Structures are given as C-alpha cells and as structure tokens.
Amino acid sequence: MTLQIGVIGCGAIGQDHIRRLTRTLSGARVVAVNDIDPQQARDAVTKYGLDAEIYGDGHEVVAAADVQAVLVTSWGPTHEAFVLDAIAHGKPVFCEKPLAVTAEGCMRIVEAEVAHGKRLVQVGFMRPYDEGYRALKRVIDSGEIGAPLMLHCAHRNQSVGERYTTDMAITDTLIHELDVLRWLLGEDYVSTQVVYPKKTRHASSHLADPQIVLLETASGVRIDVEIFVNCQYGYDIQCEVVGEQGIAKLPDPPAVGLKHGARQSVEIMTDWKERFIASYDVELQAFIDGVRAHALTGPSAWDGYAAAVAADACVRAQKSGAVEPIAMAERPAFYRG
C-alpha cells in the first residue's frame, strides 16, 4: 500500500519534506498540498512534478477523501488546530515542531488523542533518529559507563539573523536538547536555571548570547547546555555523558582529516540541515512505516507536551534568573511503555 499524504505548509521545511517524500523515501506519495501563499503551493507541485490537488485551506487537506495521513509544516501557531482536526478525522499526522505554541495547547492534543484511543501523532523531533545519538543511547542503556551523573552539552550556530530573540534560544534552539536529552536518559526534568556569560560582540543588541541552561532530572542528573548561536566557526553539537565508571561522548560527523602546510585540521559543518539530513530522512520514513503497520513509534504528543513544559520553564528562568520548577501533569497510561 502506498500511503497518500496531504502536506499543509509549502515553505522551506515543507518543500524539503516533499522532496524527500518524492525522491528519497519509499511507500508514500503526496496527493494534496496547501500553503497560505497559493503560489508557493503551485511552485511546489511544479518543482517536484506532483500529481496533487492544491487546496485553499489546510483543513480541506485534512478532510480530503484521498488523504490518508497529514504532514503539518505550516506556521507554528497554526499547528494545534490542524493536528486536532487530523485526530478528529482519525488520520495519522506528522507535525513539525512545535506541536503547539503553548504547553496547554499540547495538552489539548494529548487529551484528544487519548480520547480517540489510538496513537495518531508523531512530532518532528529528529535527533532520536541520528545515528550518533542512537549509539550514545545504546552505551548508556548498556550500563557500560554506570549510571549517568552529569551531561555537558553545547548547541552552537555560526550566526543568526536580526529577528532571532533571546527567548528563541529556548524555543527554537534548546528545544532539540530538551527532547533528545530526556529521551537519552529516559526521565523527566524537575528544574531549570539560565545564566548569562559575557555577551559576544557578534550578537545583536536585543539578543543575550551565549546562554547556559542548567537542568536537573527526576533522579538528580545535572545537565548544562551551552547555547551559542553566533559562534562564527560553524554548526557544532556536543553531548558528553559522565557516568559512575566512564564517559560517553556524542561522535562528531565524519570528516576528512587534513594534514597540510604544517597544520592538521578537520572541516566543521556550517549548516544544521547538512548535519542532520539523514535523521530527517529516517524520521519521516519511520512515520510512513509506522502508519502502514498501524503502530507509530516516533516522538509522541506526550513528548511534544513534555518539551513545551520544559521550554516554558526555561523561558521563565531566563527572565527571573532563579531556579524554576518544571511541573508536568501525570503521564497518561496511554503513553506508558
């Protein structure tokens, strides 16, 4: 069976997913598209040679009889309504982050999915599909380094635009760590604090950069995450897990080691899409396979809610300078195991 997908949102990430659905992945095809800019939807159909209907409203995509699953890649504040509509129609939905712009919105999606009685939602957190993170989790789960005690992490971007704001260091950047570190450790966060080192001269006047986010988990693991979005030298993701009897480190992407002119060097990527391109392929293929097997296994609506609650607390901590609690609702039995 070829899964027939409707895409809501034909901007950069939407077109990137259309590209992989059309040219890279197997078992699915795009049969419907929508964008707030009709020309952008038409351009996507032309560019990728789609045999797809263009709809003027995203909810029409959800309701279309030939659409079996929905891909939501529209503007963040529209996500909640489209996901809730997909659940109401009983259609599986892959939603790029954020699942909703508030934790309350995420909880409404959780409650709707629980009421429906079957998992329909997968959230677009791709790092759990990165082979480096998967290898790191295998080491942690094996017990080889003992119980994790501390994590030292960094999320560095070469530069960001003028529209990037201090809170986006949490909601756009740290959000990936909030998801993947919770997945790595298999436990929730209980508190957070944000501290500000000396500001880089490369940051705009309205942006605090870098930032250090401190997290504590339910078992007492301490995590520090450096967020530095104007580091200049490249795109660099680091994660080191300190255990009771050893240390495990996220591997860097493979690159040619160069010895030349009395110097030794390794190239560093500058584009986040290049760093995680394989993960995007794997996560969307997992969604296709999960829908066809009637068993979604990727990041759930509950994972989207957990990330939103933690992000809200981190934003509060940015403003207060204090240790802020991260208080989640009780996990429904629907999402356990």
Swiss-Prot record:
InterPro entries: Gfo-Idh-MocA_inositol_DH, Gfo/Idh/MocA-like_OxRdtase_C, Gfo/Idh/MocA-like_OxRdtase_N, MI/DCI_dehydrogenase, NAD(P)-bd_dom_sf. The keyword Zinc does not apply. Coiled coil: none annotated. It catalyses: myo-inositol + NAD(+) = scyllo-inosose + NADH + H(+). The keyword Oxidoreductase applies. GO terms for molecular function: inositol 2-dehydrogenase (NAD+) activity; nucleotide binding. It comes from the Bacteria. It holds the Pfam family GFO_IDH_MocA. GO terms for biological process: inositol catabolic process. Keywords: NAD, Oxidoreductase. Its EC number is 1.1.1.18. Involved in the oxidation of myo-inositol (MI) to 2-keto-myo-inositol (2KMI or 2-inosose). HAMAP family: IolG. Belongs to the Gfo/Idh/MocA family. Homotetramer. PANTHER family: INOSITOL 2-DEHYDROGENASE, PTHR43593. This is Inositol 2-dehydrogenase. It comes from Burkholderia lata (strain ATCC 17760 / DSM 23089 / LMG 22485 / NCIMB 9086 / R18194 / 383).
